[in-house]
Structure formats: structure tokens, C-alpha cells
Amino acid sequence: MKSKSSRTRVAILGSGSIGLDLMFKVKASEQFDLKFVVGRNANSDGLRLARSCNVETSSDGLDFLKAHEDAYDLVFDATSAAAHKVNNRFFSDAGKFVIDLTPAKVGRLCVPCINLDDMGAEQNVNLITCGGQASLPLAYALKQAVDEIDYLEVVSAIASRSAGIATRENIDEYMTTTEYALAKFSDAKKTKAILNINPAEPGVRMQTTLYAYARYRDFDRVRASVADMVEKVREYVPGYRLVVEPLESQGRITIGLTVRGRGDYLPEYAGNLDIINCAALAVASHRHATARLGATQ
């Protein structure tokens, strides 16, 4: 077991479902020393749970982290897009590395299986959206295998119980940021993102379908590129798998996937939250390894 002095000191800002699932993931890792879980409501279920897990908590939000800035090195921001834009002013001035789990689009966009190695010097890394983390690997794989993508549409369906207040408040930002990232990572001429919140009980597992109109010469190359990318995602999101292999019909390509959560805190059907948290851990682990390598040279 690593000593605490060799671990990266972590603060989690946001005590909702994403923040709590992150708490369990961080506590299970020997790379990190979880210092704080910070929220806004002292009586919230999230902060009560964190306290019961022997984690120091505060309901003073960003003010608490300002007052304790020497006690942590890395922040997971699991608040909202609007809040993150305010929060990052302090984190940037204080030289804190931030992993942004909101669709604020302030920092460098990251999908670990695509561009994790480019994140070494970034102060702020943005994880786009849950639908983005699910669909962008396939969009990028498609780009590698076709000549041109004229239109790209992504439809994600998630369980209502996995869509918290922040998710519902950020719907507009979700669409805008996902569509922007789809265009950036696929070079598609036009993109569209749709999010369906399914009220069915028991909760349904996250599913994402990608539709594309593209020009290609060898569809076997598309299949191979997608299959290779799925394996790369599964290295940090074990529950990621295709349910519809790439299909073609008159220039239209369809690919379907599902994400089963790891069940660290959230139900297995909440793959939409699990995938963005797994991506966050991948980024944090990369930064930890980079920092430790630099310290030994």
C-alpha cells in the first residue's frame, strides 16, 4: 500500500450522485488521498454519506476550498456548467488541476481513449458529457475509417433516476457541448445530439445510438476501426459494449452501444454517470503518474 505522502490529494466539489460515486472510486484507489467532499447543503444525503465514510465534508462550497487551498492538489468539479465557470477562476489563479464533469466547456476537451496523452500540461480538463464519453469514441473511430462524414447524430437514453438536478438543469449545455465535441472529434459537417430521459421502472441501462451519413470505400475498415476503439474504451469502462454492430444502408451507418455501471455506488443501470466518472479517474490517474514521474527525474 502506498503511503499517503506519495498519493495525489483530492477534493470533490459536488455531493450529488456523480460526486458520491467518485468518492467511492477515489477511496478505492491507492493513487489518491481523498481530503474533502464539499457541497452546499449541510443536511444533504450526500454529505451525510460522505461523513459516514470518514471523509471530511463542508457545506460551504467553493469558499471552503479557498480556505483550504494548501490541502489538495486536484479537484473534481461535479457541480453545474454555470457554477464551474465561476469556480475555475479561483482554481486557475491557485494553480489547481481541475477535472470538470460539467458541460461548461472551459478547459481542454478530453475523451481518454482518444487524447489522454495530450492532457499533461492542462490546468482544466473538460469531460464533455456522459453521452459524449459514450459516443465520441465511435465517432472518432468512424472518422478514421471513412472519407467524409456529412451528418452525425447521437441519441442517448438514460434512466430517469440517474438524471439528477444538475443533469436536468444542464440540458441545453449538454446538447451544445456534445454537438460541438462531435464536430471536433469527427470532422462531421453537421452534428446533432438528443437525450431521452426514460421514466421506466426498474431503471433502464444507458443506451446510445449513433447514426451517420458518410462516404466510405471499405466497410470492413469501419467495422475494424470501431471494434478496436471499443476495446480501448473497455480498458477504463469495463461495462462498455456494442449492442448493434456497425450496419450500412445506402450510405447511412448505424452503431448502438450500452454502458453497464460498475456499481461502486450507483446502480448498474446508471452507466451514463459511471462512464464519465471512469473517464475522470483515467484522467486523474494519468496526471498522478505524470507528476510522480516528474518528481523522480
UniProtKB/Swiss-Prot annotation:
GO molecular-function terms, A-Z: acetaldehyde dehydrogenase (acetylating) activity; NAD binding
A GO biological-process term: catabolic process
Active site residues per record: C130 (acyl-thioester intermediate)
Record has Phosphoprotein as a keyword: no
Keyword vocabulary terms for this entry: Aromatic hydrocarbons catabolism, NAD, Oxidoreductase
Pfam families: AcetDehyd-dimer, Semialdhyde_dh
InterPro entries assigned to the protein according to its UniProt record, in alphabetical order: Acetaldehyde_dehydrogenase, Acetylaldehyde_DH_C, NAD(P)-bd_dom_sf, Semialdehyde_DH_NAD-bd
Chain residues that bind NAD(+): S15, G16, S17, I18, S162, A163, G164, I165, A166, T167, R168, E169, N170, N272
Catalytic activity: acetaldehyde + NAD(+) + CoA = acetyl-CoA + NADH + H(+)
SUPFAM superfamilies assigned to the protein according to its UniProt record, in alphabetical order: Glyceraldehyde-3-phosphate dehydrogenase-like, C-terminal domain (SSF55347), NAD(P)-binding Rossmann-fold domains (SSF51735)
EC number(s) on file: 1.2.1.10
Record bears the keyword Oxidoreductase: yes
Protein family (similarity comment): Belongs to the acetaldehyde dehydrogenase family.
Name of the protein this chain belongs to: Acetaldehyde dehydrogenase
Source organism (scientific name): Burkholderia pseudomallei (strain K96243)
Gene this protein is translated from: mhpF
